[in-house]
Amino acid sequence: MGHEYLLEFLEKKDIPTVHKARHAYLTYYGFEQQSTYVLKEGVVKTSIILRDGREFNISYLKAPNIISLLKDEVSQYTSAPFNVRVESESAVFYKIPRVTFWEYVNKDKKLQDYINAYYREELSQAIYRQQLMTMEKQEQYVRSCTCRLNHLERK
């Protein structure tokens, strides 16, 4: 995906950034949020808390990446789909109001193409993770996730 275009676009629009330290949370599952976040620098972990209180890691994301784009494009507020915690020493995020972000997307063909590719990639990764979880034991799942992380680092 053309991450450069997204980052350049946000820079040109002078979108403010948010800095977070290691292990700080950007969002919590279920909390209302008004902004879309784009990870500019760093690594974050997305997770949810299971009913029994254990944390279930969904994925690790490295910059650049869109963090909170899931859900609809017209609501000013939406609930966070997962927890987002900084795993690197620090992380920098662009913070843009959701409605404003979608207005930009709807007016810019190149940005629309980027978002479409983003959704396709996210869907593909979600299906892959689901396959791993349903077909393998927990130990094998962890090994597969580790291999996937190594693959992502090489990209």
Stretches found by the model and what they are:
Residues 21, 40-41, 62, 88:
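A cytosolic small-molecule/anion-sensing beta-strand core signal
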Residues 1-25, 66, 71-75:
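Cyclic nucleotide-binding regulatory module and flanking cytosolic helices
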Residues 12-13, 31-33:
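Short, small/polar residue-rich loop motifs at catalytic or cofactor-binding pockets
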Residues 59-116:
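Cyclic-nucleotide recognition modules
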Residues 109-155:
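Polybasic "coupling" helices that flank or enter modular domains
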Residues 26, 58-59:
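Local beta-strand/beta-hairpin segments that build beta-sheet-rich folds
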